[in-house]
Amino acid sequence: EFRKIRSQNQNFINLCLNSKLSSKITLQPIERFDLDSAIIFSDILMIPYALGQNVNFVKNGGPKLDEFNLDLFLNNDERKFTRILDPIYEAIKITRNKLKKNKSLISFVGAPWTLLIYMLGIKKNKEEIDLVKLNKFDSQINQIIQQLIKYICVHIKNQINAGADVVQVFDSWAGLIPKTKIKD
């Protein structure tokens, strides 16, 4: 079922921003297996996308983000961010209304460091990051992290207000944080 929808919607970001299809995909496992919870169909990289960084998903290659632009990133506002992600919140509302009351609706976000690693394009592989690239942003890391925290919180709040029962924070690349940065 999902593969059919996906094959008809090549742009993954646009699929995530299609409220009706996102809800339909979310509900497929519930309808088929009567699970206890549904997980909203979305992606952790919707935050960088809403903050102005182009995100593409390359077949058999994973996500590819355009080069990070600090000025663009820092010059965002909550209204624009929320407006871009409104279709996700609408998908949550639609799904919540279609779910039985005894079923939980789970949504999610990426944690600051995980998003930062994707946004700066510094992941070499599953076990290391490009420290040379990271060091290019050394003086701005705290500022970038604080901005990410702000928008992650906005996204969490909006998802809860839309009807999510639980919001999972994925910190997929926390183990790649250099020890020198953990204190910061």
What does each model-identified segment do?
Residues E1-A50:
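N-terminal basic, low-complexity leaders that serve as flexible interaction/assembly modules and, when applicable
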Residues N9-N11, D71-K80, L134-I141:
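Short glycine/proline- and acidic residue-enriched helix-loop micro-motifs
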Residues V55-L70, N125-L131:
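A charged helix-plus-loop insertion that forms the helical arch/lid used to bind
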Residues I84-D184:
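Active-site loop segments of alpha/beta catalytic cores
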